[in-house]
Amino acid sequence: MTVTDEMTAEVFISRMYDTYGDVFNWWIPPETKTFINELVTELGADDSFVLNRSISLEAKCESCDDMLFCSVGADGSGLWRIYHLTWSHCRERGGFPRRTDLPGRKAALEYIRDNFEEEYL
């Protein structure tokens, strides 16, 4: 499946389900506040992904609990990262939570697609 610049995570997930059915393991949680709160707790409020930015949870992997977050600054700049939260309910150190930095939404969705196809097909 081709990912376009305009494609939202919701459209991407819908098309991946159309292509792969229930084997596709990413979804959009109806409630995201718990996940965002845990991310902020683990990173710390002074982290550059959090500080003066609006955070959204774009998608979650059911199989491995990875989550795609977008963080938007006041200037409209977006940071895209996949995080694997530890659920420690405290600030983490030493490379945790584990993360993958991505240059934008399209790259993030392509990363999810490519990893899914490599690991699950």
Question: Which residues does each predicted region cover?
Answer:
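Preference for intrinsically disordered or flexible, low-complexity segments
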Residues: 4-8, 60-62, 76, 88, ...
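Acidic-enriched, low-complexity/disordered segments with a strong bias for Aspartate over Glutamate
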Residues: 5, 18, 22, 46-47, ...
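Ampiphathic alpha-helical segments that act as solvent-exposed interaction surfaces
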Residues: 85-121
